[in-house]
Amino acid sequence: MNKTYVFTDIHGQYDLWVQIKNYIDESDQLIFLGDAIDRGPDGIKIMREMLADPRITYLKGNHEDFLTRYTSPTNILLWTKANNGGRPTYEALLQLSEDERAELVTAIKELPLWAAYKNDKGQCFYLSHAGFTPEQDLYLDHYDLLWDRDHFDDQWPTEEEFKNTYIVHGHTPAIYVAHRRNELQLVDYDPGYASFGIYTYEHGHKICLDLGSADTKKIALYDLDEMKVEKYFYGQKEKDTQGSEEET
C-alpha cells in the first residue's frame, strides 16, 4: 500500500537524507516541510536532489526564504551570521554557475508554503514549515507560515469541523515548544537513543516534527496514514557519541 510520510528541518545533513530516500518505496509520497539548507554542509546538494525527486512535495521554509533574498548584501550578512547558519549554503551557491544559481533560486521562490492531505480514516492534515492556527488564512499569511512562533499557545477550536483536523509543522525544535508550554512530559521518548522525539500537543491536533537535526543528527519520518512516527533516523555523529557513552 502506498504511504504518505512527512519530515522537516534536515539542515544539510546528507546522511539523514540518504537514509530517508532509500527507506521509502518508489510509490510512496514524501512531504518535506522546509529547511533543507543551512547549519549543515550539504544543504544545496539535498535541495537539488529533493527538487528532482517526483515523490517529494517540497514546502518552503524560512531558510529557503533566506536563500531567495541572498543577492542583497544586507541579507547576505544576516543569513551568514552564526546563529542563522547560512555560511555553508552561501559558499556552496558560489560554486554553482550563474545559470545554475538562477535556476535554483527561481525553483525555490516557486515552492508552495503549505499542503493538505486527507487519509483514508478521514483525518485531514494541514502542513507548513512554521505551523499556524486553524482559523488563519493560508493564502495571506506568508510570513507566519515561514517564521511564526506565536501560535504555540493558541487553544484548539471546539467546533465539530475541527475534530478530525491536524496541523503538522517544524521550524522550532519539539523540545523547545514543549518547554514553552510546560509539557515536557508529553514529548515522545526515543528509547533507542535515549533522547527526545516529536511533540504532539493541543489534544493531539498539533504535531511538531523538528528534532534540531543540525545539532542532534537525528530526524523523524512521520506516517500521515497511521498518525505515528514511522522511524527515527540517526546521523554518524550521534552514533559515535552513543557508542562512546556505552563504552564508558
Would you name each region that the model predicts?
Residues N119, Q123, S128-F132, G170-P173:
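Short, well-ordered beta-to-alpha junction loops that form the rim of enzyme active sites
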Residues D9, D35, M50, G61-N62, ...:
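Divalent metal-coordination and catalytic microenvironments
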Residues G40-A116, K121-Q123, D148, D153-P157:
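Active-site neighborhood of divalent metal-dependent phosphoester bond hydrolases
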Residues M1-E49, D53:
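N-terminal active-site segment of His-dependent metallophosphoesterases
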Residues K3-H11, C124-G131, I207-L209:
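Active-site-proximal beta-strand elements of phosphoester/diester hydrolases
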Residues V6-F7, N75, A115, P134, ...:
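Catalytic phosphate/metal-binding cores of nucleic-acid and nucleotide-processing enzymes, i.e., regions
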Residues E159-T248:
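Acidic, His/Gly-rich catalytic cores of divalent-metal-dependent hydrolytic chemistry
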Residues H11-D15, D38-P41, E64-T68, E135, ...:
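Active-site environment of divalent metal-dependent phosphoester hydrolases
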